[in-house]
Structure formats: structure tokens, C-alpha cells
């Protein structure tokens, strides 16, 4: 969600 390894 927050573009940290696609979370």
C-alpha cells in the first residue's frame, strides 16, 4: 500500500 515492497 505505501510502496514498501508492495504492502
Swiss-Prot record:
The keyword Secreted applies. One of its GO terms (biological process) is neuropeptide signaling pathway. Expressed in the CNS but not in the ring gland, midgut, thoracic perisymapthetic organs (tPSO) or abdominal perisymapthetic organs (aPSO) (at protein level). It is found in: Secreted. The modification Phenylalanine amide is found at residue 7. The keyword Transferase does not apply. Keywords: Amidation, Neuropeptide, Secreted. Belongs to the FARP (FMRFamide related peptide) family. FMRFamides and FMRFamide-like peptides are neuropeptides. This is FMRFamide-like neuropeptide GQDFMRF-amide. It comes from Delia radicum (Cabbage root fly).
Amino acid at each position: 500500500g505505501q510502496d514498501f515492497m508492495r504492502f
